[in-house]
Structure formats: C-alpha cells, structure tokens
Amino acid sequence: MAQMTMIQAITDALRTELKNDENVLVFGEDVGVNGGVFRATEGLQKEFGEDRVFDTPLAESGIGGLALGLGLNGFRPVMEIQFFGFVYEVMDSVSGQMARMRYRSGGRWTSPVTIRSPFGGGVHTPELHADSLEGLVAQQPGIKVVIPSTPYDAKGLLISAIRDNDPVVFLEHMKLYRSFRQEVPEEEYTIELGKADVKREGTDLSIITYGAMVHESLKAADELEKDGISAEVVDLRTVSPLDIDTIIASVEKTGRAIVVQEAQKQAGIAANVVAEINDRAILSLEAPVLRVAAPDTVFPFSQAESVWLPNHKDVLETARKVLEF
C-alpha cells in the first residue's frame, strides 16, 4: 500500500496498463513531453517511448478520430481531452461513431477507447474548463461514464475502463486531484464499472451522489449525526449505467432520499436517479425525493464560484427538508 493523491493513482493506473498490454496507447494535448497539464502522465513517455505516449495537435476532433481508428485496429487508446468543456469538438467521434460501433456492426467491431478528462469547479478556472457535462455523454447509449471520488476508486476504475471493450468516458474532478491522500494498493486491481459504493452506512436518509459532491455529502452526514440522524451516503462512481440495485436498496432501507450533483439541475444525472427511485421504490418513500444542484446558468467566472457551486450546507438544508416532511 502507498499513500496516493488521485492524480498519483491515475498515473499509477496508466503505468500499470501500459506495462500489461503493449496495445495500450496514451495521447492528447501536452500529454507526452510535459506529462499533461495536471501531470497525470508525467514520466510515462520517457518510460514507454514516444510511440506509446505522445502529444497531439490542439484539435479535439482529431484526437477523437485518431482514437476511433486505433481502437478499430486492435489498439486500446487512452485519449485525453485537456478539459471536458472542450468535449463539444469531439462529440461526433464519441457519440456518433464510438458509441454506435458495436450496434452498427452487429457486434463484429468495438471501440475500446478510454476518454480521460478533467472537469469540475472549485479551482478557479475559466468556465469552459470547469463545466460538468457528464449528463451530455451519459445520455448517449453505448457509452459508460465513470466519475471517481477517491484515489482508491480512481485507480481501480481506470484500469477497468481501459480493459473495457466499449468506450468509457472517465471524468476526473480537478478539485480532488491533490486535495487528500489515501492508501492505494501498489499492485493492480480493478473495480467493476456500473457498481456504486456505500461510503457511509445509515438508516434515516439516503444521500445519493458522485464526484466531489461525495465529500460535501459526507460533511453534511457528519452534521446530521450531531442531531441524532443517521445518513447513508451512496457514491454512484459510474453514472452510466447506474447501479439501480444499490440505489433502490438504500432508499427502501431509509425511506427518504436526496440526490446531489455539482452540475446544473436541468437534465442532469440527479433527475435520472430521482425518476428511477419513483419508478421502482415510490411505495417505500416517506417524503418526496429532492435534488441539490447548481443553478441553471452557465458556469460563472471564478470569483463567483463559491456562491454558485453546491456545498455541504446546501446538502444539509435539503436533507432537513426531507426529514421534516
């Protein structure tokens, strides 16, 4: 075991798969020589060579097309979109081609592409760099969307993503890159995609969330505990496909739920989770399921982040509304 930040765990996962499989390639803007804008690929080009870890032009559409072609020719590309706000440039390759390849070819062709990208607020970047656009890609059939909240989860999930035979969007919250360390096995391990994790057991309320909001939700759960309220925190980890069984099991146990996301409220992951709960567990509910999310505006300039982003106080306020219903 070693104490790792999330960025170190991601680097370790990439190194593991580059060693394990000569068909794994890692590339993107500034990924090679500089080791990535956040140094996630630092040292990998020197270790594995320019043919396997390399820089690309500043053109997301070209990076996506390259990954698509490599995936169809026996490689396992790990492409990086430098910030997920730039995903619009590559959506045709991702949702129009990669996601449909298995269906189009009747299972004869697949796109084993991993799309890594930083996202999320709290670090005062320009708005396009921080956008939470997971809902945009999660809506596309044929794509898995993974968002880890801890270093341990990041390594295991990324290894699983690279080994998956279909496209996986792997989103890394910038605020979590170096905010804390955690014990992470130095040997390889995997975490199954599509499986949520109960980060805190509880009996009175289910808080269902993912990414950086896991930590805000855990803070809120600590505050609720002071009032004698036992809150369960469910980390989705994979937002597409959802782990419906874990969500419903938690809600049926507690009878109350809130769903927390950093992204804007409209058409988000939280809305999908609420709909699934209402479809499958409405008779178990003792109160309406409420959401915590950002306002339906564009991501603000960095000075306004603190009033725009959801935090543990918002989670706490919403939880109390549900508990008092």
UniProtKB/Swiss-Prot annotation:
<comment type="function">
    <text>The pyruvate dehydrogenase complex catalyzes the overall conversion of pyruvate to acetyl-CoA and CO(2). It contains multiple copies of three enzymatic components: pyruvate dehydrogenase (E1), dihydrolipoamide acetyltransferase (E2) and lipoamide dehydrogenase (E3).</text>
</comment>
<dbReference type="InterPro" id="IPR009014">
    <property type="entry name" value="Transketo_C/PFOR_II"/>
</dbReference>
<keyword id="KW-0670">Pyruvate</keyword>
<keyword id="KW-0786">Thiamine pyrophosphate</keyword>
<keyword id="KW-0560">Oxidoreductase</keyword>
<dbReference type="GO" id="GO:0004739">
    <property type="term" value="F:pyruvate dehydrogenase (acetyl-transferring) activity"/>
</dbReference>
<dbReference type="InterPro" id="IPR005475">
    <property type="entry name" value="Transketolase-like_Pyr-bd"/>
</dbReference>
<dbReference type="InterPro" id="IPR029061">
    <property type="entry name" value="THDP-binding"/>
</dbReference>
<keyword id="KW-0964">Secreted</keyword>
<dbReference type="InterPro" id="IPR033248">
    <property type="entry name" value="Transketolase_C"/>
</dbReference>
<protein>
    <recommendedName>
        <fullName>Pyruvate dehydrogenase E1 component subunit beta</fullName>
        <ecNumber>1.2.4.1</ecNumber>
    </recommendedName>
</protein>
<feature type="binding site">
    <location>
        <position position="60"/>
    </location>
    <ligand>
        <name>thiamine diphosphate</name>
    </ligand>
</feature>
<keyword id="KW-0963">Cytoplasm</keyword>
<dbReference type="Pfam" id="PF02779">
    <property type="entry name" value="Transket_pyr"/>
</dbReference>
<comment type="subunit">
    <text>Heterodimer of an alpha and a beta chain.</text>
</comment>
<comment type="function">
    <text>The B.subtilis PDH complex also possesses branched-chain 2-oxoacid dehydrogenase (BCDH) activity.</text>
</comment>
<dbReference type="GO" id="GO:0005737">
    <property type="term" value="C:cytoplasm"/>
</dbReference>
<dbReference type="Pfam" id="PF02780">
    <property type="entry name" value="Transketolase_C"/>
</dbReference>
<dbReference type="GO" id="GO:0005576">
    <property type="term" value="C:extracellular region"/>
</dbReference>
